[in-house]
Regions:
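Short hydrophobic beta-strand that contains or immediately precedes a catalytic carboxylate
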Residues: 57-65, 72-73, 294-298, 304, ...
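Fungal secretory targeting signals
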Residues: 1-34, 61-64, 71-72, 510, ...
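Conserved beta-strand elements of beta-rich interaction domains across eukaryotes
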Residues: 68-69, 180-182, 222, 235-239, ...
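Aspartic protease catalytic domain
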Residues: 344-489, 496, 500, 514
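C-terminal membrane-anchoring module of eukaryotic surface/secreted proteins
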Residues: 445-605, 612-613
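Extracytoplasmic, non-cytosolic globular domains
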Residues: 237-238, 248, 290-335
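Signature of the N-terminal lobe/flap region of pepsin-like aspartyl proteases
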Residues: 34-163
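Aspartyl protease catalytic domain
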Residues: 21-36, 146-286
Length: 614
């Protein structure tokens, strides 16, 4: 069987009709997926049909961006209807492993072995997954190009457990986009080499070779009509705006130093009593004042931060913490809800731009992208939520953040991973493919205006005099200049100049009259002042009161009143904090064992043998 598979691989390389001389653009599904999105996914075909070698078996949609193994949901996932009578995973497609002649699920003798156990899914365990899974290899076909021996983890059954202990079914698998190695090798005596879709196309792609072992991606937004973009061996430059962060990766993860999170307004008035508020990351937790290392991970859905940080963000929003889900639900009846979501309001994430820590880069995420929807089976009716999940697990910026950001990596030659601002729904989305060079990797941003890609979506609020900036790092992004004057302004200047000239003339005339009067009356009072001086007697108000009425008025004339100003209250509205939760403990990677809390019984972990997998 092994020899046949290798012969089949060589044969298929010769029968390819499509030629790719540059980066390979992936195809995105026309559907969107939940139950906490909507999210976008790419289409691939897994396995090969035994009756017709050229017809793969199962088309599935996968969330792209993982590293090392791809996680594929099997059709047997729908056998368990205890969680839900509806198999939501069927919408994205399931892999029927029984019909694939190229599947190998026995050669790799390493965990997971096909028994029930905790399963790593991304880089946070805030919503742990318990599954019956095992290692395997099989073919994956992308746009007519078959890729053999792809590293997989097949999931026969499983669920995810939310903070209330309720279990919910899995719905969409993940597509690995490589690792720091071209292959993942298993075994000591007999070595088994597995591959990844982009490493194979780079190393053995033949006529479909891509220029580098890399990718560039912007997952976009299904709800706002921002199409997804994924290129293997390159990137779409129109999805990269402005400066680009370049960081070292750690194994298959993308760590970066997050310095602060602030709230801002791109233009117009603010839904708050201020236009900018910073230091929200460390609010309530001074240990975060110097920043926090987070991991950017497209396979996890939410923004996972310490509890104090999520609470600080929530305190500025009309949201309520829901402990059953570990998420914040929007109060859609609050007038602030529509103001915030439709105006140019955003969260700004300030990062270290590079490993030298001598520059920053800011990624802005409009609140319109942070108005996501929970659907069945998580909730009975669609519910809007704010995707910050408090966690003591590894802090992660997942798909909710990456709707507004470009992410990419060049795996080889001491490569780097990249982060940049991505455009909004008013961008042209005309693909401008750029190559990631093999030995001199870099990503260049476009000169497009980020604000312009959102103007059609936003309705700026009227500006008020009570708005101010708040925080020590208040941004000046909202300052504007206008060199042109309207007709009304010009007329106002002319009228003002005329009035001002008349006022100056009146002052001069008044001064002359007063001066003449003073000269006339000075002689009549000369003797009196002389007498007072000779007697060396101090004058007082009583003596001066004997002067003439006109002279007394001149000597005691009051200056014109000055215009007075009152400073009103600039304090904004206050919001009740979410219910108090447990304090944040030291972050770590330790995972707790998770017992079943759902309305069904788990199979005994020791009761499932390897033979039952097949």
């Amino acid at each position: 069987m092994k020899h046949f598979r290798y012969a089949f691989a060589i044969f298929t390389l010769y029968v390819q009709t499509s030629v790719c001389t540059g980066p390979r653009q992936m195809t995105w599904s026309t559907k969107s997926f939940g139950p906490d999105g909507p999210w976008q996914a790419v289409n691939v075909i897994v396995g090969s049909n035994s009756s017709d070698l050229m017809q793969p078996t199962s088309e599935v949609a996968l969330y792209p961006g993982g590293s090392w193994e791809s996680k594929i949901l099997l059709s047997s996932l729908c056998d368990n209807q205890t969680l839900s009578p509806i198999c939501y995973a069927e919408q994205a497609g399931l892999f029927n492993s029984d019909k694939s002649m190229t599947l190998d699920n026995t050669s790799i003798q390493l965990p997971p072995y096909g028994t029930w156990d905790d399963l790593e899914w991304g880089y946070t365990n805030a919503v742990p997954i318990y599954a019956r899974a095992r290692r395997a290899t099989d073919w994956i076909n992308i746009q007519g190009t078959p890729i053999p021996e792809v590293d997989l983890i097949l999931i026969r059954a499983g669920w995810q457990t939310y903070p209330n202990g309720q279990a919910y079914p899995l719905e969409v698998g993940t597509l690995s986009l490589g690792s720091p190695e071209l292959n993942q090798t298993f075994g000591s005596t007999i070595k088994i080499n597995t591959t990844f879709v982009n490493s194979y196309l780079y190393d053995q792609g033949g006529v479909n070779t891509i220029p580098s072992y890399s990718y560039g991606m912007h997952i976009g937004s299904a709800s706002l009509g921002i199409p997804g973009s994924l290129h293997l061996g390159g990137y779409d430059q129109s999805r990269v705006i402005g400066e680009v962060s370049s960081q070292s990766f750690n194994s298959g993860s993308f760590p970066i130093q997050l310095f602060d999170i602030s709230l801002g307004v791109a233009e117009g008035g603010s839904a708050w009593s201020y236009s900018n508020k910073s230091e929200l990351l460390a609010q309530g937790n001074s240990s975060l004042s110097s920043g926090l290392t987070v991991i950017v991970d497209p396979t996890n859905p939410y923004i996972y931060l310490p509890q104090s940080s999520c609470d600080a963000l929530a305190a500025e929003l009309p949201v309520t913490y829901q402990p059953d889900y570990g998420l914040y639900f929007w109060d859609t009846s609050d007038p602030q809800y529509n103001k915030i979501l439709t105006s140019p309001s955003y969260l700004a994430f300030r990062f270290s731009k590079n490993s030298l820590n001598n520059a920053d880069i800011t990624i802005k995420v409009p609140f319109a992208l942070l108005n996501l929807t929970l659907e069945a089976p998580l909730v009975e009716t669609p519910t809007q939520y704010f995707p910050c999940m408090p966690t003591n697990s590894t802090p992660v910026l997942g798909r909710a953040f990456l709707q507004a950001a470009f992410v990419g990596v060049n795996w080889l030659h001491a490569g780097k991973w990249y982060l940049a601002q991505a455009p909004g729904p008013d961008a042209s989305f005309i693909v401008n493919t750029a190559t990631m060079d093999e030995k001199n990797p870099s990503v260049s941003g476009s000169a497009s205006s980020w604000e312009d890609t959102w103007k059609g979506q936003w309705v700026p609020l009227p500006e008020t005099s009570t708005e101010k900036t708040s925080g020590t790092d208040a941004s000046n992004d909202n300052s504007t200049s206008d060199t042109g004057l309207s007709t009304g302004a010009k007329i106002g200047i002319i009228v003002g100049s005329a009035v001002g000239g008349a006022l100056v003339l009146a002052i001069i005339i008044t001064f002359c009259i007063r001066h003449r009067r003073k000269q006339t009356s000075s002689q009549s009072h000369e003797d009196m002042y002389k007498m007072v001086d000779d007697s060396s007697t101090k004058t007082n108000e009583g003596e001066l009161a004997e002067l003439s009425v006109s002279e007394w008025k001149q000597l005691n004339e009051l200056a014109p009143d000055r215009e007075r100003y009152e400073i009103g209250s600039e304090r904004g509205p206050f919001y009740e904090l979410a219910p108090e939760k447990k304090p944040v403990t030291e972050l770590g990677n330790n995972k707790d064992a998770h017992s079943q809390c759902g309305p069904f019984e788990l199979p005994d972990r020791s009761s499932v043998s390897k033979s039952q997998w097949i």
